[in-house]
């Protein structure tokens, strides 16, 4: 079986070429060809000796996930469904803004966590994505979006906020992050790459030590009682532990704050008392808040908070001195908005089956 070189960051690629008896600079050449030029085969790499290209063709490959579907929203948001084999597909989303282009990348086929308000969580879980399948999403998006009139890449920011919990696929995510940041890869700044987590505390500490990019935490509740219900991981790592981990992360973080993501669920977590509890909860954590109006999906059981409740909630936080943004709903007409990504998941957890039985029972 041929080795997929897309699975390697520069360090891994250098080791691979050393094993082939080649000098380290070959790794940099090949990395630039793959990620900066978008090369899909070794014959395109004209500055490599023919003998090396022949050897690479025999022993290795550049295997990129195949494109299954591409959609474009009325607001310019783009969504791609990529084939990762055995009937599974993952989604990646490009969100254009006036000052940046952000790509939202998936890390797993489905998600092993069961956040109750998330469409991906309802799909169950199949497996972790390889580093090649993660970075392949950025490869595809760069190819599709091209460059600006100034010859700059359209994609300037990456957020690991697609399907899956990135921290649960730690090693492959870190390899992909390394490629994103490498000057021979995509050359992104650590400040422009964000990893989102539901609160896997040990992995947050590991990421701080090996790849401290910007961090977003899917908080969604101001107390353990509510968070236990909607983010079951909280039962393992309750809010006190999570806040302490956030403080530790900031020691090495590229930004001097944590972004707390907070989906606004009508009657669940959107009252004024919840906002005041939040202020108390994050007292010792430099942070900003990103309030996310819930994006409905079929049979979710939740409703989006009213605009008035969101406004009051935001105002309470702002009056306490916090930077607060209310996320614009983007791409919801193609199910590309936050919490709507589902892809195609061959579920190994029977979670899809469980939810179908619950819905049948409710209808009966």
UniProtKB/Swiss-Prot annotation:
Residue ranges occupied by any Radical SAM core domain in the UniProt entry: 97-333
Name of the protein described by the UniProt record: Dual-specificity RNA methyltransferase RlmN
UniProt organism field: Neisseria meningitidis serogroup B (strain ATCC BAA-335 / MC58)
Disulfide linkage: 104-338
Functional note: Specifically methylates position 2 of adenine 2503 in 23S rRNA and position 2 of adenine 37 in tRNAs. m2A2503 modification seems to play a crucial role in the proofreading step occurring at the peptidyl transferase center and thus would serve to optimize ribosomal fidelity.
UniProtKB keywords: 4Fe-4S, Cytoplasm, Disulfide bond, Iron, Iron-sulfur, Metal-binding, Methyltransferase, rRNA processing, S-adenosyl-L-methionine, Transferase, tRNA processing
Active site, renumbered: 91, 338
Reactions that this protein is recorded to catalyse: adenosine(2503) in 23S rRNA + 2 reduced [2Fe-2S]-[ferredoxin] + 2 S-adenosyl-L-methionine = 2-methyladenosine(2503) in 23S rRNA + 5'-deoxyadenosine + L-methionine + 2 oxidized [2Fe-2S]-[ferredoxin] + S-adenosyl-L-homocysteine; adenosine(37) in tRNA + 2 reduced [2Fe-2S]-[ferredoxin] + 2 S-adenosyl-L-methionine = 2-methyladenosine(37) in tRNA + 5'-deoxyadenosine + L-methionine + 2 oxidized [2Fe-2S]-[ferredoxin] + S-adenosyl-L-homocysteine
Further remarks about this protein from its record: Reaction proceeds by a ping-pong mechanism involving intermediate methylation of a conserved cysteine residue.
């Amino acid at each position: 079986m041929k080795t997929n070189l897309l699975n390697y960051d520069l360090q891994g690629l250098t080791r691979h070429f050393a094993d082939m008896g080649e000098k380290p600079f070959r790794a940099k050449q090949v990395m630039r060809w793959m990620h900066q030029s978008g090369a899909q085969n070794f014959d395109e790499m004209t500055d490599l000796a023919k003998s090396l290209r022949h050897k690479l063709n025999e022993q290795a490959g550049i295997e990129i996930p195949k494109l299954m579907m591409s959609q474009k929203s009325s607001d310019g948001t783009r969504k791609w469904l990529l084939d990762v084999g055995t009937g599974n597909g993952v989604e990646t989303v490009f969100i254009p803004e006036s000052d940046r282009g952000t790509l939202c990348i998936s890390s797993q086929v489905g998600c092993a966590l069961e956040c109750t308000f998330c469409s991906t969580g309802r799909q169950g879980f199949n497996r972790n994505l390889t580093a090649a399948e993660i970075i392949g999403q950025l490869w595809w998006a760069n190819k599709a979006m091209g460059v600006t009139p100034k010859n700059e890449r359209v994609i300037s920011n990456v957020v690991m906020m697609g399907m899956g919990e990135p921290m649960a696929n730690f090693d492959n995510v870190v390899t992909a992050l390394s490629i994103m940041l490498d000057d021979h890869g995509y050359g992104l700044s650590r400040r422009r790459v964000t990893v989102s987590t539901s609160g896997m505390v040990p992995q947050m500490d590991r990421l701080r030590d090996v790849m401290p990019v910007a961090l977003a935490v899917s908080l969604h509740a101001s107390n353990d009682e509510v968070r236990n219900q909607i983010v079951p991981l909280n039962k393992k790592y309750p809010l006190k532990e999570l806040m302490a981990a956030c403080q530790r992360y900031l020691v090495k973080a590229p930004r001097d704050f944590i972004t707390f993501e907070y989906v606004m669920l009508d009657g669940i977590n959107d009252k004024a008392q919840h906002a005041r509890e939040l202020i108390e909860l994050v007292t010792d954590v430099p942070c900003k808040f990103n309030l996310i109006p819930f994006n409905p999906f079929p049979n979710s059981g939740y409703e989006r908070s009213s605009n008035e409740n969101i406004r009051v909630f935001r105002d309470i936080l702002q009056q306490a001195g916090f930077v607060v943004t209310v996320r614009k709903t983007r791409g919801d007409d193609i199910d590309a908005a936050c919490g709507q990504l589902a892809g195609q998941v061959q579920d190994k957890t029977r979670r899809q089956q469980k939810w179908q039985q619950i819905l049948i029972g409710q209808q009966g």
